[in-house]
Amino acid sequence: MKFQRTAIAAAVAQIAVLSSNAAWAQQTVDAAQTAGAPQANVVVVSGQRAALQSAQKIKMNSDEVVDSIVAEDIGKLPDRSITEVLSRVVGVTMDRSAQGDPQHLAVEGSGISIRGLSYVASQLNGRESFSAGGGHSLSFSDVPPELMAGVDVYKNPSAENIEGGISGLVNLRTALPFDFKGFKGSLTGSESYSTLRKGAPAPSGSLLLSNRWNTQYGEFGALIDVAKSKTKVRNDEMFVDPYYPHVGAGPNGTDLYIPKGAEWRSQAYDRDRRGDYAAFQWRPTKDVTAALTYFRSRYTEDWSEEALLGQETSWYDMQVANGVFSPTGAFLAGTISDPNNGGINYNTDHRVSDRQSSTQDFSLNVQWRVNSAWTVTNDFQRVMSQTHALDSDVATGIKLPSQTLDLRGDQPTYTFSPSDIAYLANPQNYYWAYTMEHLDRQEADSKAWKTDVKYSFDNPVLRDIRFGVRLQNLNGLNRMTNPSYNWQGITQPWNVGSGNGNITRQAFLGDPRFSGGTELGTFPNFFNGDVKVPAAVFPTDAVARNYPNSYSTLHGYYQALCAVPGTCAAWVPAGFANDPAAVNKQDEKTRAFYTQLRFGFDDLKYPIDGNIGLRYVKTTTNSSGYTVFTPPSNLPSGPNVTGANLVPIFGALATPMAYETNYHNFLPSLNLRLKYNDQLQFRFAVAKSMSRPDFNQLQAYTTLAESVRSTSTGTGTNTQTNVTGANLTGTGTGNPLLKPTTGISEDLTAEWYFAKAGSLTFAVFNKNLHDIVVNTLYNYSLNDTAGQAHNFTVTGPANGAHGYANGIEIAYQQYYDFVPDWLRGIGTQASFTLVNSKRQLNNPVRSAWCTGGAAADNLNLAINGCDTNMQSFGDLPLQGLSRKTVNFAVMYERGPIQTRLAYNWRSRFLLGVNNFGTNGTDAIDLNPNSPTFRNITANNDQAYGLPLYQEAYGQLDGSIFYQFTPKFRIGLEAQNLTNTTVKQTMVQHVGNLGHAWFTTGPRYTVQASYDF
């Protein structure tokens, strides 16, 4: 009956009031103050139990659906990175792959999703923050956790919050000098050690100083916080290439699927990160407070990698000895070879990447309490962010005689004969193969001003009304070299010949002219000694880093071996030209207005409070670019050609385009809370939100292409060509006319707070999404030379889908004070999230086969995925969404000892359908209705892309600290205690096949801190 009365009361309240909110965005948490709770930026100084109490108070007293993590002390968040901290929050998952590159791991995570969706807004102290590149989101791995006082995750933000997050909003909080009673000092130092990267310690340290003074001009406060850290780890990685169909090679003429081979590599990763934060406060009177803050995060990321990479082009010639196959015909074990072509083509490459990034934030906040009713707050912010990088890859080549693989275990097993091991270690078997460089320079700048006004009512129901305005100008400029990744062969097998542009032979290392610049890579302790791989010859680190000088030397070998001197083109480095394909300039202006009413019915049997609000946002974007068309050079002509008139003739085109886009969004919100008693409460929240496309999706650059459809009969001079028409297609790099994705979010929660650090909460949520950005088809009209208009079918991003994500969250935490005395101090935290989702295209693209030529087939590949036999997949889940997520932690805190063991697990999720490593252009067409059916000579025209998944992954971390004095403590932290391997699988029609295995090994950190 109690729960029935609660439901009735909640329903009556929802009908009677229509309102909702969360009031932290103006730097205060009024609901928390009303209840006597600390503000969201309160400093907690008494261990992990007190930190949990503080976070629980924020959640319990907030006007919104929020989860928080509070630092035990300044600079003492419970993990080594912001992304790892966020992954402990119920409903939040962390991506462990490098951003946009599932072929590499991000040691501390590259991004997060909230409730399965990546539309996350990021803020620093309630202000929008971002990293250069996308322009709308902050790379959390760039932010030093040592500078943070807490992290809040708002899952259904209200009208007064800055727009931008459909799945949620993450607010990073730093301390202010008035948060402390007087002087505060803290010094922390640590040393990290990676079990895979032996002999490479990584020191870190941070220092905070804060004080406040009373003067004749009012009270002043100053705070300085500096953090510097080094990260040195190693990633060991193994890969199995996609499986290709060998038609009729199995028993009774069945098809066998055989991979091109297997690969391995090892990466040494270094990062230096520096964070600086300063805050100054002035309170000239009790009614006026001003705060000036400066925040800067900068880092240098450098990694060096040696990899043995498969480059086999004649997969159809590969043979298997002693083969073991699955019932579907997929290769499981055996020895792979390519005797018809002298061995399996492999490259041994040395790749280095050096990226430098920085983000600066200047902010000024002035709050004036005009009288007991009126409060006015003005806030000014300037953000500047930039990043630039060099990615350099130099490779040698070798023909591997054979490769013996066993893929029946948890990870691949390699077996090499003594002769194969000796062959790989001999430099004379290698030649200089290729170079590839990529450079980028990205910057973003924002100026923002907002004014918030609050009027407090003297009324038993109406508490206050808030309204305000926010203006922002955001500019972004992204520049890349063109071509973006400038792959250039040095001496490739297909270069060998006697004609113009050919070489007489390859530049083998056995030739004294070409012998320098290599070393033997031995892969010591690979996968912690669990996997044995042979040594191989690689270019040195110095050769890879000495761009462009080393590149010029290597490509000189091509000139030295030129069969016809003067006909071999010189190497040209990639440069930052004004080519519009390499430049993306975006200007964005936003004008936002909001109003929000807070209320409370405290006299009801079950008190109800909440807020209702509306936010209006106008967004104006300006971008410029080009539409480009280059006429084909091989149009059929001559007396043996019929139907040539069916091919329209277009002139070359490079048309500058300028776009200005305006869109208006009205974002209502409602938050209600019903208090059943002092411990049990219920919430209902509904809001509309938006997420703007990032700058990369808005690039205004479209390339148009024309290809001829024809059939041929006869041979030689008797060949007769019949032209049947032309394919008019195009590719849009971005779409400057994109609108924001919008969503309507609904939350219903039950929250039981049975102790200061004890709670059991349950949430049901639903998010309906509209205008999801996906690749789709649209027409571009172009006149031919005769003035006739023709439509090119262009593939590019558009607002072409809708969908939903719904599910439940359960969270529990408690310290067990009722247990016998010898067990006191033990506590646990646990959470579980279940998400269901679906995405539906507005104009579905789905066919059983992909042919890789027409635009519709390319779109089929990009959305549904295509196998190496050209069958499509379809019915794929939302990218990056794990259906289940689990967190569990055991804590102990008593006397001077404090420990924690924390386990984080997420279920399988889709990484993408057209990723490097699981895509290509050399599939075979087994579509029986296709004109290229089983045409092995045309296989290089068939594009494929396999759905790539990360399998379920769980990681155990731990820490133990000892408090020697109230001011000094020392401790040990550990990550990945169970040495868990990250596994990726690729889906093919013959099964879910292993593609990649990654390990970083356990990491340990010794830490000492002193407060003064």
Label the predicted regions.
Residues 83-128:
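Extracytoplasmic beta-strand/coil segments of soluble accessory domains associated
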Residues 198-334, 354-365, 370, 670:
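Transmembrane beta-barrel wall of Gram-negative outer-membrane proteins
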